[in-house]
Curated annotation (Swiss-Prot):
GO terms for molecular function: 1-deoxy-D-xylulose-5-phosphate reductoisomerase activity; manganese ion binding; NADPH binding. GO terms for biological process: isopentenyl diphosphate biosynthetic process, methylerythritol 4-phosphate pathway involved in terpenoid biosynthetic process. The gene is dxr. Pfam families: DXP_redisom_C, DXP_reductoisom, DXPR_C. The keyword tRNA-binding does not apply. It comes from the Bacteria. This is 1-deoxy-D-xylulose 5-phosphate reductoisomerase. Keywords: Isoprene biosynthesis, Manganese, Metal-binding, NADP, Oxidoreductase. Catalyzes the NADPH-dependent rearrangement and reduction of 1-deoxy-D-xylulose-5-phosphate (DXP) to 2-C-methyl-D-erythritol 4-phosphate (MEP). Mn(2+) binds at D150, E152, E221. It catalyses: 2-C-methyl-D-erythritol 4-phosphate + NADP(+) = 1-deoxy-D-xylulose 5-phosphate + NADPH + H(+). NCBIfam families: Dxr, PRK12464.1.
């Protein structure tokens, strides 16, 4: 029986993780849950999974959560705010922490879990994108295991099992191409919010669906792969793979290529993140390659995906610039989801913010957090200015 804490239990990764806990009750026990603001769903999860500690990110919602849990015995310890999230992440009973919080908000709780000696099933790419310079040294210091849950990084992690150190030459991250893979670049100025939220293959949260449409999701994954697997950016490539069956590939020193294949369903990489180093039998339909018939790949169209280029540039520059890019992207996507900016304004805003940032080459945690906050403010201010001056 493995005791887990789930950060971001009411989001897409969180709810799918709990599906698996319910499917394998003899293997997994939930000891901690957190949500930023979805009090009603969090209360339902508490009633079903009976954790020992629960955190709500928005402190003002704690009384409502307490009220919804009236009659629960034993009542879990209830905490709130960033400090509460970190308390749950470091809960003494947990062996593995699943980080399903969206965005840079997952950084501090993940660091708390590492300092408490917990293995991390990492579903929050922003933790490494923004915090790689501080997270990886801490992982090594505390000797914890970092198991990637993103489907692409899980695929690479799986392909590397048993591969001798030093044999990895190149990583090939696959991308569906998002909602606009079949649109000409000239038509992207007509994109609506509804258009951008129509992902062709995956069922995901709203923010990551927009990131898939801009290919920023893949750009952030390039930076994450750099930190996880130690390759420089010249050896991490992106392939458009419309079927989303090959989740990523690795090329070895002798030119052999290994790949991990599966249906586009996050339950599989989440389950591997929970069970590693074991593999659990599942009742799911096996992959039918004969039925699929063919798999296709092509290079990404750089004109359509400027966010991808911004991510490569930020990763190569390093320091605080990836944190700035990530924070600006979170802020810009939030504005787009509120229909306050246009789709093509997202990369324009990101480029302006990155140009204005004074990069700190070897940042501390405080430097990263300050850069994150600055980028969010700068993005909001630029978006309020006249589009002709700022976003054209």
């Amino acid at each position: 029986m493995q005791a887990i804490t789930l950060l971001g239990s009411t989001g897409s990764i969180g709810t799918q993780t709990l599906d698996l806990v319910a499917q394998y009750p003899e293997r997994f026990q939930v000891v901690g849950l957190t949500s930023y603001s979805n009090v009603a769903l969090l209360a339902e999860q508490v009633r079903r999974f009976r954790p020992q500690m629960v955190a709500i990110g928005r402190e003002e919602l704690l009384p409502e959560l307490r009220s919804l849990l009236t009659g629960i015995r034993p009542l879990p310890e209830l905490v709130a705010g960033t400090e509460g999230l970190c308390q749950v992440a470091a809960h003494p009973a947990a062996q593995r922490v699943v980080t399903g919080i969206v965005g840079c908000a997952g950084l501090l709780p993940t660091l708390a879990a590492i300092r408490a000696g917990k293995d991390i099933a990492l579903a929050n790419k922003e933790t490494l994108v923004a915090g790689g310079p501080v997270v990886l040294p801490l992982v090594r210091e505390y000797g914890v295991n970092l198991i990637p849950v993103d489907s692409e990084h899980s695929a690479i992690f799986q392909c590397l099992q048993g591969v001798p150190a030093g044999s990895l030459r190149r990583i090939l991250l696959t991308a569906s191409g998002g909602a606009f893979r079949d649109w000409p670049a000239e038509k992207l100025d007509q994109v609506t919010l509804a258009d951008a939220l129509k992902h062709p293959n995956w069922v995901m949260g709203r923010k990551i669906t927009i990131d898939s449409a801009t290919l920023m999701n893949k750009g952030l994954e390039v930076i994450e792969a750099h930190w996880l697997f130690g390759l420089d950016y010249d050896h991490i490539d992106i392939l458009i793979h419309p079927q989303s069956i090959v989740h990523s590939l690795i090329e070895l020193a002798d030119t052999s290529v290994l790949a991990q294949l599966g249906w586009p369903d996050m339950h599989l990489p989440i389950l591997y993140g929970l069970s590693w180093p074991e593999r659990l039998a599942t009742p799911w339909d096996p992959l039918d390659l004969v039925k699929l018939g063919s798999l296709t790949f092509k290079a990404p169209d750089h004109r359509k995906y400027p966010c991808m280029e911004l991510a490569y540039a930020a990763g190569r520059r390093g320091g605080t610039l990836p944190a700035v890019l990530n924070a600006a992207n979170e802020a810009a996507v939030a504005l787009f989801l509120q229909e306050r900016i246009r789709f093509l304004d997202i990369p324009r805003l990101l480029e302006r913010v990155c140009e204005r940032h004074q990069v700190i080459a070897d940042p501390s945690l405080e430097d990263i957090l300050q850069a994150d906050a600055w980028a969010r403010r700068e993005t909001a201010q630029l978006a309020q200015q006249a589009p002709a001056q700022v976003l054209a």
